[in-house]
Amino acid sequence: MRVREMQRNWQHLGKWGLLFLGILIICNANATDDLWVTVYYGVPVWKEPTTTLFCASDAKAYDPEVHNVWATYACVPTDPNPQELVLGNVTENFNMWENNMVDQMHLDIISLWDQSLKPCVKSTPLCVTLNCTDVNITMSDINGTSLKEDQGEIKNCSFNVTTELKDKKRKQQALFYRLDVEPIKNSSNIYKLISCNMSTVTQACPKVSFDPIPIHYCAPAGYAILKCNDKRFNGTGPCEKVSTVQCTHGIRPVVSTQLLLNGSLAQEDIIIRSKNITDNTKNIIVQFNRSVIIDCRRPNNNTRKGIRIGPGQTFFATGEIIGDIRKAYCNINRTLWNETLKNVSGEFKKHFNFSVAFNSSSGGDVEITTHSFNCRGEFFYYNTSGLFNETEVANNTNENITLPCRIRQFVNMWQRIGRAMYAPPIEGEIQCTSNITGLLLTRDGSKDIDGKEILRPIGGDMRDNWRSELYKYKVVRIEPVGVAPTKAKRRVVQRAKRAVGMGAVLFGFLGAAGSTMGAAAITLTAQARQLLSGIVQQQSNLLKAIEAQQHLLQLTVWGIKQLQARILAVERYLKDQQLLGIWGCSGKLICTTNVRWNSSWSNKSYDDIWDNMTWMQWEKEIDNYTKTIYSLIEDAQNQQERNEQELLALDKWDSLWSWFSITNWLWYIKIFIMIVGGLIGLRIVFAVLSVVNRVRQGYSPLSLQTLIPNPRGPDRPGGIEEEGGEPDRDRSMRLVSGFLPLTWDDLRSLCSFSYRHLRDLLLIAARTVDRGVKGGWEALKYLWNLTQHWGRELKNSAISLFDTIAIAVAEGTDRIIEVLQRAGRAVLHIPRRIRQGAERFLL
């Protein structure tokens, strides 16, 4: 009976166990739909920063030209294998008018000019009275008067200067251009240098020349330069053809006004760029699709003489002009120039729907009203009215447009107000050929008699010159750490066993920028390898450039910039690694966390995120919540580390081999003694209890090992001789001798005792649970029946209420109808009553 009862109980218990197991499985299945924050390292994500760029060039250390000298110390060697990686399915916004690269280049070229003039002589001591006369020009006209120098354009001046001895004076003679001197008190012969009213005038070194070389701007490691390859890109707005480069193309920092020289050309049609074409205060940058050659010459064969103006100072001036004195001039092919202007006008008509007319500059400083540039160390200023005056251009039929030039030796510094530079005369004839690749224009805001918008050349702000080359670039900061929701949850905090190797190139890193998040996550290893090796490669080049400056015993401004770029790259990498370490993700490309994803951060579905979005789109989606997510990951990691510390404090079973350590033997001996002592004590307790039990029954113990039969009942005869009977299971007791058998017997008795009581306890618990479940089920059934009963009662009550209301309404309606009928009948019977009354009255 007991066995059957146990079977029935276990059957019920098994049913309920299966029920609970099914519920648990369902709950776990639902739990798998939860999303958890996962950290990814090496994702193709970038943001727009402000950072320090460095330059690269093929400068020649032996060349005294100022750009070569500057680039030798300021720039690293160019990459012989420049790489460019096209980013498919990427659209990026560019803005050439708000580009930090332009400001950096502007400061760099200012630094170049300042550094080039640092070791040269200040000409302030030459601010003396000049007694000047006009140089006699006897040259006959050539082809009219185009090449004949104007009378009075060159002055022959004499003046007194201080010799090596400060108390001694010496009279000197030199030639100056009319633009470099000004009369004193309207005198016809007494002059002074035009620069004497300026604070500082620095003379360029006599062996220095200005011939710009291509300079490449490069991004430090951890940053990238994005390039727009759209051939019709106007410099502002989204660009769909984006690539990434390490450095820009070679940019020649040509300082010029009105015309852009030796720049890059548009690949298809002429491109017109302006911050706001309808605003006449905004300059217009025109980029040609075909260059126009301009050939400039100074035919005068000048000589140079040195004038001592004090101890250790020499002022270089023009001594004499050998041969004919002729004007400096520039030649431009008339047909090609007219065709270019016609195409520019057509572009304005095509894209902005208005016709334009060109005219000469409206006035201002000579640097703005003329096209100024540096040719082999001489500063040329030539009048461009012959280029932009349509009437003059149309009436002239010569093959070339010849523009007369004027030369200045005292030049206002374009980089800052109140400073000037004296350019020493260059000996011999000078010739330089350049390519006109663009224009700087401005709108008058008014129209001519034909209703055309008037465009005039302009210049002065060299940032526009740099914008014409940097319009298609922007610098971005790579953000390799990204977070996204996944279905994987971190279960335990595991210590990283090894670090993941980092190394590759920037282009592999951003190669998956246009891919979906799911596709990009597969290539994380290749992307992450870039970060460290890219840093090492760039820092090696920077270090070589810095080492080249060690003999100077001090770093230049650019040397400091190189150090900044080097340190910045390492700091960026270490910052990312520190962040991963705080999150417990060191050395991992994909790191799960136990932070539950909050749908308020993004309500997009899991499939929509991983199958349809790029990492850039996803980063913009959660940008406002990034700090919150980072904080939650850090808090969760701190909690896990505390849990791990507590767990490790209790964990003494790190390795099975530690069990055999000699340091644990003492513990083993203690445990063995405790077990043996416990068994002996247990044996003593059972023996004492047995003796006490038998003494109470009237027996005296002869020995602890003597078999003492248990008393038999009167209904069970003893099994002696032939008498039968069922032997009692407690009738005999096994006699054991020895320590180990005795120990084993006691241990077996203890286990049997424990098993019986635990079995009874489990049966009691099972019965209790079964009864409780049955009682709960009966209670639920009772509640369900009670609910159904009261539901039926409520339904019947409601129906009865509705019936009563309907009857009352019907009866009331009948009464109202009856009253109305009676009233109607009374009204209808009025004539009858009148007639009956009349009849009675007449009768």
Swiss-Prot record:
The chain crosses the membrane at residues 672-692. It comes from Human immunodeficiency virus type 1 group M subtype F2 (isolate MP255) (HIV-1). Residues 693-843 are cytoplasmic. A lipid is attached at residue 751 (S-palmitoyl cysteine). Residues 132-156 are annotated as: V1. One of its GO terms (biological process) is clathrin-dependent endocytosis of virus by host cell. Glycans are attached at residues 30, 89, 131, 136, 143, 156, 160, 186, 197, 234, 262, 276, 289, 301, 333, 338, 343, 353, 359, 383, 389, 395, 400, 435, 598, 603, 612, 624. This is Envelope glycoprotein gp160. Residues 1-33 form the signal peptide. The keyword ATP-binding does not apply. InterPro entries: Gp120_core_sf (IPR036377), Gp160 (IPR037527), GP41-like (IPR000328), HIV1_Gp120 (IPR000777).
